[in-house]
Structure formats: C-alpha cells, structure tokens
Amino acid sequence: VKELGARRWWAVAALVLASMAVGFDVTILSLALPAMAEDLGANNAELQWFVTSYTLVFAAGMIPAGMLGDRFGRKKVLLVALVIFGISSLACAYATSSGVFIGARAVLGLGGALIMPTILALLPVMFDDEERPKAIGAVAGAAMLAYPLGPILGGYLLNHFWWGSVFLINVPVVIVAYLAVSAWLPESKAKEAKPFDLGGLLLSSLGLTALTYGVIRGGDAGWTDATTLASMVAGLVALVAFVMWEKRTLDPLVDLSLFKSARFNSGTMLGTVINFTMFGVLFTMPQYYQAILGTDAMGSGFRLLPMVGGLLVGVTVANKVAKALGPKTSVGIGFALLGAALFYGGTTDVGSGTGLAAAWTAAYGLGLGLVLPTVMDAALGALSDDSAGVGAAVNQSIRTVGGSFGAAILGSILNSNYRGDLDLGGVPAAAQEAAKDSVFGGLAVARSISSSSFADSVRNSFVSALDIVLVVSGFLGLLGVLIAVVWLPREVGQSTAKAPESEHDAADAA
C-alpha cells in the first residue's frame, strides 16, 4: 500500500473530507438546539439526549469499528460508514419528533465511530515513517478547521433556512468524500482474519458506554449523584473485566502488549491532554464571544479563526521542527507555548475585547499545531499494519473518554465558580435558578428585571470563571511538557520492528 506514489496524497484529500464531515457535526448541533426545542417540543432532558445519544454510540462503536476494518477491509468499512453518516444526517434533518431525532443521532454516532478509527488506521498503513507526520498533520488540521467552520456555516444556514439545514450540510460533504474514497483510497486489511472476540467486543463497548455516560452525567448532576457513581463504577468494572478477558482469551480483540510501547502510551496520553485543553477553548470561548462581546454564533466562529491560523502554521512546520530539534523538544516547546497562551487567556476581563482573545488563541493554535502531528504519529507509528484498526480505535477511545472527562471537569469548574461569584441580591427567588444555570440565563434574567447591575454581575462572574478554566487548562499544558520530556521517546518516527521502545530499551539493545 505504501508504494502508491502521488495517489496516496489524493487519498489523504478523501480522508480530510471524511474527517471534516464528523468535525462539522461536533460543533453545529448546539446552534440548532433552541429552534429544535421549539419545533419538536423537546424538553431539557430530550435536548440532553440529542447530544448524549451520539456520544454514547460513538464511544461504544470505535473498538468494534477498528476490528471490522482490520478484518474486512478499511476502505469497505469507510465507504459503509459514509453511507450511514449521510443517511442518518438526512434523517436528523427531517425528524418530526424528539424520539426520531434521538434515534437518528444515535445512528449518526455509529457512522462517526466507524469513520474516525478507520481514518487513523489507514495513515500508518499508507505512509512510511518519513511522510506519515505530514499526512497526519493534514488530516488533523482539517478536522480542527471544522470547529470554527461549523458555527460559521451553521449560523448562516440558521439565519436563512430551517434548523434541519445544519444537518443537510453533511450530505454533499459525504457524497464527495465517498466518491473520493472510492477513486483514490487503496484497500488494506489484516493478512489473516482473527476469530471474533465476542466477549472482548461486549465488555469494551459496555465499559466505554457506561463510563462515558457517567462522566457526562457527572458534569450535569454532580459527581456524588447515585446514577453518576453507578455508571462510572459499572464502566470501570467492565473495563477491568475486559482487560482480564483479553489476557486469557486465545485470540484477543486488543493485543495488550501494545501498552508496553512507550510511543503508543506517551502519544495517547499527550493526545488526551490535548483534548482536555481544547475543551477550555472550544467550549468556553464561543460563550465569551456571544455573552460578553455580543456576537452571534456565526461571529463567534469567525473569532476562532486566529486559532485555526496558528494551528495551520504549526502543522505546516511541525515535521521540520521535530526533525531539527527532536520530538521530545519540539513537543515540549509546543505544549509550553499552548500552556503559556492559556495562562495569558486567563488574564481576560470584561473589557478585554477581541484583541487579547485573538492573540492568545492564535498562540494556542500554533502550539497545538506543533504538537498534534508528532503526538499522533507517536501513537499511530507504534501500530502494525495488521492491527492498525483496533490500535487506532483504542487510541481514539482513550482520547474520547479523556476529552469527556475534560469537558465534565472543566465544565463543573466553570459552572461552580460562575454560580459562586454571582450576586443574586435583588433577583426574585423564582428567577434565581435560571440565572445560575448559565451566563445566557443570567443575562436573560437581567433583561427581564431591567437590572444593569445584575447584568454586570453576570458578566463579571462568567469571565472570572472563564479565567479559572483557562488557568487550569494552562497547567494541563505544563503537564504535557512533563510527559513529553519524561516519557516521549527520542525517536517516534520509526516502526516498532526497527526501533527500541525507549531510551532504556535503546541502552539494552546496545
């Protein structure tokens, strides 16, 4: 597969389109929720399931998706996944009830679960050590580009059409991606099909689903909530049982020796840290732009473009920097830069305006771009061609659950500090819960009681909470520096068959 010449880069273009389709869907739903609540008559619980149904199926489906790609062919699985994603997007767009929409979103999550691990599995199979970081940078950069483009395109569509149009945007992207994958992507799969590990499939899916649900619920209902604790404990028990099963079964779904790889472990952990810090930016900053600066959703998307600009610059030079300085140093510098940017963002006040936000988000994007290709290459480069699907799915699963933890924990920090600083004096008791619910709820209450002083309290409380979230995210960036320096091997661009796993192994090999 690696001997395809220029055709491989056309294949990367196909993978870029597929990853952008999933990326659009991540950011675009939140824009449509108010209109959907009114049109479908959805209550708050149903609105939460609009989001949760996708996330749970996505978490449960990734490892089975990796196995299917390894067994039946990654190109075949990706084509089927694109069809599922396109049809379920149509079903979402034309849903006539909350139940229908939740079901369609669950199927959409299945499509996403099939797409992402398959894309990641194809990169180490298609590219050698020299070119793989460039391909990873292209796919990762495109996926990140979808985050600001989602609100921009979604905001435009909602201003001119009905809410279903934000899901129809997936359809042409999927069609073009399908044609491109069909034309340019080579087929690849394991040389020998392993027997189905049904026990491993069931335990991994159950564990990831229960743990993810517990984390999501914990962010809303609290970490001492009985259902939260029960879900998280059940998930952890299932995952421990999964590991024990994999150790004893003759044909395990996941080769646990993968976790002896310093490259895979460090790359996966650093990817999880990245997902944590991204929440600090991508969840909080659109709220800041809309609630504090008064932009609409489309305007908040435009204000994320400095971050994307920095990201694209970082991705472009990341491979050269890693070659010149070594991956330990280049990744350490990238995490130090994004951490410093987050600390700078933590100095924001109500009167800061767009200039400060543009400066620190651009610096954050640059740091992110410097680390993403090398970190992903560390994990994906440790995979053999035969097990690339399952290995990529394990990497994606850990990063997804880690990102969910980041969203829940940082979201809890944001909410608790916002509520703790809010001055509710003079606010009617009946309106206090709505004011504490979110910055948007607080501003709505301030308008309803015609209180400019309470509006000021809402804004100040939110910005103070935002600063704390960004500072915590900054410390996570410093954690990334520590992991890179201590754990990341000096060389990550060598295949597992050719390179020792770590400095300790290198000494032994000598």
Language-model features, listed with the residues they occupy:
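Transmembrane core module of solute transporters
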Residues: 9-58, 62, 142, 162, ...
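Flexible interhelical linker loops that connect adjacent transmembrane helices
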Residues: 2, 176-205, 247-262, 323, ...
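Hydrophobic transmembrane architecture of multi-pass small-molecule transporters
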Residues: 176, 376-378, 382, 394, ...
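Structural signature of transmembrane alpha-helices in multi-pass secondary transporters
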Residues: 22, 51-54, 58, 85, ...
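Residue-level signature of the transmembrane alpha-helical cores
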Residues: 18, 80-84, 88, 104, ...
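C-terminal membrane-cytosol helix-exit motif in multi-pass small-molecule transporters
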Residues: 172-189, 207-216, 235-248, 480-488
